[in-house]
Amino acid sequence: MIIQRVVLDSRPGKNGNPVAENFRVEEVSLPDTINEGQVRVRTLYLSVDPYMRCKMNEETGADYLAPWQLAQVADGGGLGVIEESKHQKLAKGDFVTSFYWPWQTKAILDGNGLEKVDPQLVDGHLSYFLGAIGMPGLTSLIGVQEKGHVSAGSNQTMVVSGAAGACGSLAGQIGHLLGCSRVVGICGTHEKCLFLTSELGFDAAVNYKTGNVAEQLREACPDGVDVYFDNVGGDISNAVISQMNQNSHIILCGQISQYNKDVPYPPPLPPAVEAIQKERNITRERFMVLNYKDRFEPGILQLSQWFKEGKLKIKETVANGLENMGVAFQSMMTGGNIGKQIVRISEDSSP
């Protein structure tokens, strides 16, 4: 059986911007038979995410991430349908997902590494399992709960950077749902700002490309900032931290502005900003959702309930075809997406 796959063809360099040409599509042969415990799957959707930029380097700089190897298939969040199974708990026609799904049209996988999903949780929108009802949703929910210390009735102001992206667009809504009295998003286009305030219920939005971020934040957050969901790092985060209140909290979700630079993760703050953090007793801890696996099942059910009740709005940017994985990744890294960037590999979900 001949299938297509995407391999890493070249590295952008630790300080380079990734381009679509760093990836290559090739045809390979897939065995016709599977072994006990294995399943053959057809890929329906693949995810591209900022953390993958680290995997393009020879060393990721993160102890929980292994680098992609040159000329080897890339992997990440994926979802597919089982075409054949020799695994006792998985059957033909089941929908399954994995955090380590190969970028292939079809694959033979170890069934023990797959998670069966229920289409009813997403009203049939299977790609949502790679976004709002999946890892980005869990990251946003558990991050706000564990590191944001949000409590209803506390009159807290929350700021979200990268607010129109996969995690940011969810984190702001979740902040409201858990009790924040004011939620402000930071993003890079007028269209995204409008999306945040008119569709997602953010109280205000700051466009970092059209004005002074610090001044816009002072206007949008007259009572200062109590919770900061940080997706970007860099100058934007420095501006936010400078306006945070005593005993406030930073949820360190990502640092996309720093991923193309040869710096440690999380990167250290400039001395003046670090002094503010210490003086005001602001918590800033690296958040790893994979450390909270016992919270995944109740978290997915909560996210699904909010979605079905219309309280959690979900937005996707969808590219089509395995050949566009590199294009979608490059676009996502430069802010071309609103909501979760997804790549549809096959439209046929039948087994």
From Swiss-Prot:
InterPro entries tied to this protein: ADH-like_C, ADH_N_2, GroES-like_sf, MDR_fam, NAD(P)-bd_dom_sf, PTGR2
Keyword Glycoprotein found: no
Matches recorded under SUPFAM superfamilies: GroES-like, NAD(P)-binding Rossmann-fold domains
GO function term, MF aspect, one: 15-oxoprostaglandin 13-oxidase [NAD(P)+] activity
Any matching Pfam family: ADH_zinc_N
Gene Ontology terms: biological process: prostaglandin metabolic process
GO cellular component: cytoplasm
Key word Nuclease present: no
Principal localisation: cytoplasm
UniProt: substrate binding residues: F99, Y100, M288, V289, L290
Enzyme class: oxidoreductase
Binding site for NADP(+): 165-168, 192, 208, 231, 253-259, 287-289, 337
EC number annotated for this UniProt entry: 1.3.1.48
Reactions performed catalytically: 13,14-dihydro-15-oxo-prostaglandin E2 + NAD(+) = 15-oxoprostaglandin E2 + NADH + H(+); 13,14-dihydro-15-oxo-prostaglandin E2 + NADP(+) = 15-oxoprostaglandin E2 + NADPH + H(+); 13,14-dihydro-15-oxo-PGF2alpha + NADP(+) = 15-oxoprostaglandin F2alpha + NADPH + H(+); 13,14-dihydro-15-oxo-prostaglandin E1 + NADP(+) = 15-oxoprostaglandin E1 + NADPH + H(+)
Record family assignment: Belongs to the NADP-dependent oxidoreductase L4BD family.
Known function: Functions as 15-oxo-prostaglandin 13-reductase and acts on 15-keto-PGE1, 15-keto-PGE2, 15-keto-PGE1-alpha and 15-keto-PGE2-alpha with highest activity towards 15-keto-PGE2. Overexpression represses transcriptional activity of PPARG and inhibits adipocyte differentiation.
Protein name: Prostaglandin reductase 2
Organism per entry: Rattus norvegicus (Rat)
The encoding gene: Ptgr2
